Regions:
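Helix-loop junctions and hydrophobic alpha-helical segments within the transmembrane domains
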Residues: 120, 127, 131, 206, ...
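Solvent-exposed, membrane-proximal periplasmic/extracellular interface segments of envelope transport
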Residues: 1-13, 32-34, 370-459, 515-536
Length: 813
C-alpha cells in the first residue's frame, strides 16, 4: 500500500518545469499533473519487469464514491440538505423574506421532479406575530387612554389630549429611525410604556387650561396662562422621567444590547410629548375649547367635587395626626417590603415560540448509524403527538442557528438534534407536549434525551450552572459526579448535563518494537499504513473534463474489529506481515472531555428548572450542598448560568438606579432650590418600590430583568405626581396663603390630574400586562402596582411631609 501511495502521489504532482521560446512564441512545458480520466488511473503501472506489467486496475478497484457521511439530515422522513439565511443588521426582515421566497420560487422551476424544496420555518412569521401583538397592545392602550380622557374631561378636551399621542409617536419614530434603531421588539415596547406617560403632560396642561378658562372670557389668554402655570412642573417631571430611562443606555453586557432601544424610544417620545404639550396643546385648546360651561357633567366635575368636599376634609384630619399617619405608612412600607423574600427571582422567561428542541446524546463510541436509529425511533413517538406539525432531524450534528441565542454545538457521531415545529403557540398545549415528551424519553436507556424550550434574552448557559475549577482531572470527575447526583435528586431540576465524565473507549495498538524489528517492519510506515487501511490516504486530485476537482483516496476494504489484526504491512524484504504478529490490540479509556475557564481546567455541571420551580431555590440548595462538601485541595467553584447573568445585569442595573436617583435629585434641587422638598418628593419612590413587590407577590410573578427595568422606570414616573403637588403648594405660598391651606388647596386642585395621569398610564400598560406574555407581564405589573401605591402616598404622605418640611415661603427649613 505504501508503494502504491508513493507512486500515485508522484504521478499526481502538478509541476511546471519551465518554458521554451520558439522564435516569437513562448510555450510552457507540462510534463505530468493531475489525473483527468479514470483510464489514466486504471492504467497506472505499479510494477513492471521483463516478464509482466502490473497496473492499478489489476490489484484495485477504481470508482467514484461519495465521501463517508459525517452527519445526516432528515425532514419528513426523507434525506435533506438544510439551508439557513441570517439577516444582516439594519435590514428589513419582511423584505428579505419576500426576496428569498421569490428566489426559491424561481429556483424550483429548474429542479427535476425528484427534488423538492420545503420551508421548515420562517423567522418573519414569529416577528410578524409579535409585532402585530405589540401593535394590538398599542392600539388597545390608545383606545383605553382615549376613553378615560373622554370620560374624565369631555369630548373637546379628550380630542386635544388624543391628538398629542399620534403626533408624539410620529415625531419620535422619525427620530428613532434617524438614530439607527428603527422599529423592533424593544422599541415597540418602549412605545407602549410611553403611551401612558406621554399624555401626562397634555392632561396636566389641558386640566390647568380648563380651570383658567372659568376665570376669564379670553380663551387664548387662559390657554397661555394655564400652560405657563404648569410649564416648569411638567418640564421638570419629563426630565426626571427621562433620567430614569437614559442611564439604561450605559448597561453593559448582552442584556444591555438586548434592551437598549427601549429607553431610547421612551426618551424620544417623552421629549416629543413635552414639545407638543407646551406648544400645540395650548393652541388647540384656544381653538377647540368652549367658552360656555358644558351642560353635560364629566367625571372630572364629580372627581373635583369629591376632592373639594371630602378629600380635603379627610386630608385635613389626617394632617392633624401626622405622627400616627407616618408611623402607619412606614409600617405598611416595611410590611410590603418584607414580601420580597417570597417573590421568586429569575432573569428571562420562556420565549413562547411554536418550536421545541430535543438534544440526543447516545453513549460514547456510538456510531452514526446507531444514533440515526435511535432518533428515528423517537420520531415514531413524536408523530403520534397531534400538536406537532413538522419534524427535522440532524444526526451527528446540531441544527443550524435557528434562534438568536441558540448556539450550535460541535457535531459528533453520538450526538443529534431534533427540531419540532408546532401548529401554533398555546401555553397549555406546549406544556402538555413537553411533559409528555419528557415522561416518555426519560425511560429510554438508549440515549440521554433533553427536551428544551427556547428562552428570551442573551446567550447564557443553562439556568443552573456550576463551574468546578481544579488542575486535577480525577478530582474534577469525582466531585462533578457527586454534584450531578445531588442536582438530579433536587425536585424540579431537569435536563442535567455533566459532560466531564464522558470519555470514548479507544482501541490502543501497543507495538512490540523488538518483534517489529525482527519482522523487518519500518516503524515510520506503520502509522501511515494503518491510516490507509482504516481511513484511507489522500494522494492527489482528479480533474474531469468540466474542470471539477475530486480528491483521490486510497484505502483498503473496511475491516471490522476481528479483522483488524489481519491487516498486513510489507516489510523490508517485500513480505506481507500481519500486524497481529507484533501489535497487541486492546481497549482503553480515552481522554476525558473537560473545559477551560480562564486557562484553568474546569468541569461544568448544569441543569434547567421545571416550569413550576424556581431557579433561585434550586441554585440555593446546590450552593448549600457545595458549601458543606469537602472540596479537594486546590478546587473551588463558581456559579454560572442565570445566577451569574443576574449578578452581572442586576449589578449594572443597581448602578443605573443609583445614577438615576442622583440625577433626579439634582434636577429637583435646582428646581425647588431646596434639599428637603426633593426629599419629600423622593418619598414616593420607596412606596412605589414596595408597591411593585406587592404586585409581583399577588400575581405570583418572579422578579425578572424586565421587572427590574420597570422598577427603574418607576423612579422617574412616580415623582411627577409629587413634583406637581409641591410646585403648586409653593405657588400658593408665593401668593401669601397660609401653609396648611396652601397645601390643602394644592392637593385639591391637583387631585384630578394626578388621578387621571395615573389611570391613563395604567390604561396604556394594561394590554401589554394582560396580553404581552411572560416577558412583559412583570414589567407591566411592577409599573402598575408601583403607581397605585405611590399615588396613595402622593395623596396622603406627601402633603403631610410637605407641611413638616416647608416654610411659609415654600423654601427649605
Amino acid at each position: 500500500v505504501a508503494t502504491i501511495n508513493n507512486l500515485l502521489q508522484k504521478r499526481a504532482i502538478n509541476i511546471t518545469p519551465g518554458f521554451v521560446d520558439a522564435n516569437t512564441r513562448r510555450f510552457n512545458v507540462k510534463t505530468s499533473g493531475n489525473f483527468q480520466h479514470i483510464d489514466e488511473l486504471n492504467d497506472t503501472v505499479v510494477f513492471a519487469n521483463a516478464n509482466a506489467v502490473i497496473r492499478l486496475k489489476d490489484i484495485a478497484r477504481v470508482e467514484f464514491s461519495s465521501r463517508e457521511a459525517s452527519y445526516l439530515a432528515y425532514y419528513d422522513g426523507k434525506p435533506v440538505i438544510f439551508l439557513t439565511a441570517e439577516q444582516r443588521k439594519h435590514t428589513n426582515i419582511f423584505a428579505l423574506t419576500e426576496a428569498i421566497e421569490q428566489e426559491i420560487a424561481a429556483f424550483k422551476q429548474t429542479l427535476p421532479d425528484t427534488i423538492k424544496i420545503a420551508t421548515l420555518f420562517k423567522q418573519s412569521d414569529g416577528v410578524e406575530s409579535r409585532v402585530n401583538g405589540f401593535f394590538d397592545n398599542l392600539w388597545q392602550g390608545l383606545i383605553l387612554v382615549g376613553l378615560m380622557s373622554l370620560v374624565f374631561l369631555g369630548l373637546r378636551e379628550a380630542i386635544v389630549i388624543i391628538i398629542a399621542i399620534p403626533l408624539s409617536f410620529l415625531i419620535a419614530i422619525g427620530w428613532l429611525d434617524f438614530s439607527g434603531f428603527g422599529l423592533q421588539q424593544m422599541s415597540i415596547v418602549g412605545l407602549i410604556i410611553a403611551l401612558g406617560l406621554l399624555v401626562d403632560n397634555a392632561i396636566v396642561v389641558t386640566e390647568s387650561i380648563h380651570r383658567e378658562k372659568h376665570k376669564t372670557s379670553n380663551l387664548a389668554g387662559a390657554s397661555a396662562l394655564g400652560a405657563s402655570k404648569v410649564g416648569w412642573a411638567i418640564t421638570s417631571g419629563t426630565v426626571t422621567t427621562m433620567l430614569a430611562f437614559l442611564p439604561m443606555l450605559m448597561l453593559a453586557s448582552d442584556t444591555g444590547d438586548f434592551v437598549r432601544s427601549m429607553p431610547v424610544t421612551v426618551v424620544l417620545v417623552l421629549l416629543a410629548s413635552l414639545l407638543i404639550a407646551l406648544t400645540l396643546t395650548p393652541l388647540l385648546a384656544s381653538k377647540f375649547f368652549s367658552r360656555k360651561e358644558s351642560k353635560v357633567k364629566t367625571l372630572q366635575f364629580y372627581v373635583n367635587s369629591f376632592a373639594e368636599r371630602y378629600y380635603v376634609a379627610w386630608l385635613s384630619r389626617l394632617m392633624r395626626a401626622k405622627l400616627l399617619m407616618l408611623v402607619s405608612a412606614f409600617i405598611a412600607l416595611f410590611a410590603m417590603a418584607s414580601l420580597f423574600g417570597q417573590v421568586g427571582v429569575s432573569l428571562f422567561p420562556k420565549a413562547e415560540k411554536s418550536m421545541l428542541l430535543i438534544d440526543v446524546e447516545t453513549p460514547a463510541n456510538s456510531s452514526l448509524d446507531y444514533t440515526n436509529e435511535v432518533m428515528h425511533s423517537m420520531t415514531d413517538f413524536i408523530e403520534t403527538q397531534p400538536f406537532v406539525e413538522k419534524i427535522a432531524l440532524n444526526v451527528g450534528n446540531s441544527n443550524p442557528r435557528i434562534y438568536y441565542n441558540e448556539i450550535p454545538k460541535r457535531g459528533v457521531a453520538s450526538y443529534g438534534q431534533l427540531l419540532l415545529v408546532l401548529k401554533a403557540y398555546n401555553e397549555k398545549e406546549v406544556n402538555r407536549l413537553v411533559a409528555a415528551l419528557r415522561t416518555e424519553f426519560s425511560a429510554w436507556h438508549q440515549a440521554k434525551i433533553t427536551v428544551k424550550e427556547f428562552t428570551q434574552g442573551p446567550v447564557t448557559d443553562q439556568p443552573i450552572t456550576v463551574r468546578l475549577i481544579s488542575e486535577s482531572l480525577s478530582d474534577l470527575e469525582r466531585v462533578a459526579a457527586d454534584l450531578a447526583a445531588k442536582i438530579a435528586a433536587i425536585p424540579g431540576a431537569i435536563n442535567l448535563d455533566s459532560p466531564i465524565g464522558i470519555a470514548n473507549t479507544e482501541l490502543a495498538l501497543a507495538i512490540d518494537y523488538d518483534k517489529a524489528a525482527l519482522s523487518g517492519i519500518d516503524i515510520n510506515q506503520l502509522d501511515s499504513s494503518i491510516q490507509t487501511a482504516l481511513s484511507g490516504t489522500f494522494i492527489g486530485q482528479f480533474n474531469d473534463s468540466n474542470g471539477e476537482n475530486y480528491p483521490i483516496l486510497v484505502r483498503r476494504p473496511k475491516s471490522d474489529l476481528a479483522g483488524l489484526s489481519d491487516i498486513t504491512i510489507v516489510n523490508q524484504q517485500g513480505e506481507n506481515v500481519p500486524i497481529g504478529q507484533f501489535v497487541e490490540i486492546k481497549l482503553q479509556k480515552g481522554r476525558t472531555d473537560f473545559f477551560h475557564y480562564q486557562k484553568l481546567r474546569m468541569a461544568r455541571v448544569s441543569a434547567d428548572a421545571a416550569k413550576e420551580y424556581s431557579v433561585q431555590q434550586i441554585t440555593t440548595e446546590v450552593v448549600s450542598y457545595l458549601d458543606n462538601y469537602q472540596l479537594p485541595a486546590g478546587m473551588y467553584y463558581l456559579l454560572g448560568g442565570e445566577e451569574e447573568s443576574r449578578q452581572e445585569s442586576f449589578a449594572g442595573l443597581s448602578q443605573i438606579m443609583l445614577i438615576t436617583a442622583i440625577g433626579i435629585f439634582a434636577i429637583l434641587v435646582l428646581q425647588f432650590k431646596s434639599f428637603l422638598q426633593p426629599l419629600v418628593i423622593f418619598t414616593s419612590i420607596p412606596f412605589a418600590m414596595t408597591g411593585a413587590v406587592l404586585g409581583l407577590y399577588i400575581t405570583g410573578l418572579s422578579f425578572s430583568m424586565m421587572a427590574f427595568i420597570g422598577l427603574i422606570s418607576l423612579f422617574g414616573i412616580v415623582v411627577n405626581n409629587a413634583i406637581i403637588l409641591v410646585d403648586t403648594t409653593n405657588k400658593n405660598l408665593a401668593e401669601n396663603m397660609a401653609k396648611k391651606p396652601a397645601i390643602l388647596l394644592a392637593s385639591s386642585t391637583r387631585f384630578t390630574p394626578i388621578l387621571l395621569t395615573t389611570i391613563t398610564t395604567i390604561g396604556g400598560l394594561l394590554p401589554l400586562t394582560l396580553l404581552g406574555g411572560s416577558l412583559w407581564q412583570p414589567l407591566g405589573v411592577v409599573i402598575i402596582s408601583g403607581l397605585c401605591v405611590s399615588a396613595i402616598a402622593s395623596f396622603i404622605i406627601v402633603p403631610i411631609l410637605t407641611e413638616l418640611f416647608t416654610k411659609t415661603t415654600g423654601s427649605e427649613l
